[in-house]
Amino acid sequence: MKATLAAPSSLTSLPYRTNSSFGSKSSLLFRSPSSSSSVSMTTTRGNVAVAAAATSTEALRKGIAEFYNETSGLWEEIWGDHMHHGFYDPDSSVQLSDSGHKEAQIRMIEESLRFAGVTDEEEEKKIKKVVDVGCGIGGSSRYLASKFGAECIGITLSPVQAKRANDLAAAQSLAHKASFQVADALDQPFEDGKFDLVWSMESGEHMPDKAKFVKELVRVAAPGGRIIIVTWCHRNLSAGEEALQPWEQNILDKICKTFYLPAWCSTDDYVNLLQSHSLQDIKCADWSENVAPFWPAVIRTALTWKGLVSLLRSGMKSIKGALTMPLMIEGYKKGVIKFGIITCQKPL
């Protein structure tokens, strides 16, 4: 979601499980955040596509665009141009300054690259073209363009975000390397095999059809290209478990109404979807502890005089978002919400 320091060696990498109960059924309820209507669906664990009506999907796109049209300016004013979580040391009790939290957001990018295996000069040289799927106001794109000297293209549903991202690229003398446009992640306007790095930093949670989302990521990846998905998920279901507990789903439904998150899935679901495309080096990790300090920091910022004034000026969507933040913390603490990374490589 475009809203966001552990000893790297302490992180657990989980390869995909061939004995997963991929295919067992669970029931989901998709509530369109822009209306009181709901669409009842049945999905499978691993096949998590949401069979929403076309009108509901269009309402979702419009809702996401309007949400970020309204809230992105507030986020940039308070937190800067990286609209994603920071990466912290687990159980850190240090009260970081604003600059410390912004450094943690940069670390999130670096840790994601490290986890995906983009760690040495030889690997970095291979990255010539990057797509940032759900780019926000382009913080990741501009960082990656500078780091790799690569051509980066960011896509977002929000015209306000796309314009601001292009303006910032021009201001930072990066317009020749980083460009941004309004486009749908489920129907990307790019030819097959275009990008050496396919980057999705906290955008997957907005996708109503996870299978189509993954299919598009794979389609636009070049042979040998890396795919990095960093996203909010719900916990993995245990063996024999068909669905989340009702109280768990209730928390997710409330968050969905504010942040336009139509279909939660688990990291296991993502792994199985990627496995179905015969990708290589599929791995995932739970980084929930590494992002735990972030939402309390957002709340503390919102409760400052500057934060309150900015919230009121930004509008009702921002205010609703601030009021929903405690639910994110509750979900994390109760183990319902997980912050996951899933990476893989497309075969040559």
UniProtKB/Swiss-Prot annotation:
Keywords in UniProt for this one? Answer: Acetylation, Chloroplast, Methyltransferase, Plastid, S-adenosyl-L-methionine, Transferase, Transit peptide
Pathway(s) the chain acts in: Cofactor biosynthesis; tocopherol biosynthesis
Where does this polypeptide localize? Plastid, Chloroplast
Q: Which residues carry this modification: N-acetylalanine?
A: A52
**According to its UniProt record, which reaction does this protein catalyse?**
gamma-tocopherol + S-adenosyl-L-methionine = (+)-alpha-tocopherol + S-adenosyl-L-homocysteine + H(+); delta-tocotrienol + S-adenosyl-L-methionine = beta-tocotrienol + S-adenosyl-L-homocysteine + H(+); gamma-tocotrienol + S-adenosyl-L-methionine = alpha-tocotrienol + S-adenosyl-L-homocysteine + H(+); delta-tocopherol + S-adenosyl-L-methionine = beta-tocopherol + S-adenosyl-L-homocysteine + H(+)
InterPro entries linked to this entry = Methyltransf_11, MTs_g-TMT, SAM-dependent_MTases_sf
The record's statement on gene disruption is: Slight reduction of fresh weight in mature plants. Leaves with high levels of gamma-tocopherol and absence of alpha-tocopherol.
Q: Which GO terms describe its biological process?
A: methylation; vitamin E biosynthetic process
EC code: 2.1.1.95
Q: Segment SAM motif I: which positions? A: 130-139
* The keyword Transit peptide appears for this protein: yes
Family matches, as Pfam families: Methyltransf_11
Question: Which residue ranges are recorded for the region named SAM motif II?
Answer: 193-201
- GO cellular component terms? chloroplast; nucleus
Residue numbers spanned by region SAM motif III: 220-229
Give the GO molecular function terms: S-adenosylmethionine-dependent methyltransferase activity; tocopherol C-methyltransferase activity
The transit peptide region is found at: 1-51
Q: Sorted alphabetically, which PANTHER family does this protein's record hold?
A: MAGNESIUM PROTOPORPHYRIN IX METHYLTRANSFERASE, CHLOROPLASTIC-RELATED, METHYLTRANSFERASE
Q: Which family does it belong to?
A: Belongs to the class I-like SAM-binding methyltransferase superfamily. gTMT family.
Role: Involved in the synthesis of tocopherol (vitamin E). Methylates gamma- and delta-tocopherol to form beta- and alpha-tocopherol, respectively.
Question: What does the further note read?
Answer: Seeds overexpressing VTE4 show increased levels of alpha-tocopherol.
Q: What is this protein called?
A: Tocopherol O-methyltransferase, chloroplastic
Protein's organism = Arabidopsis thaliana
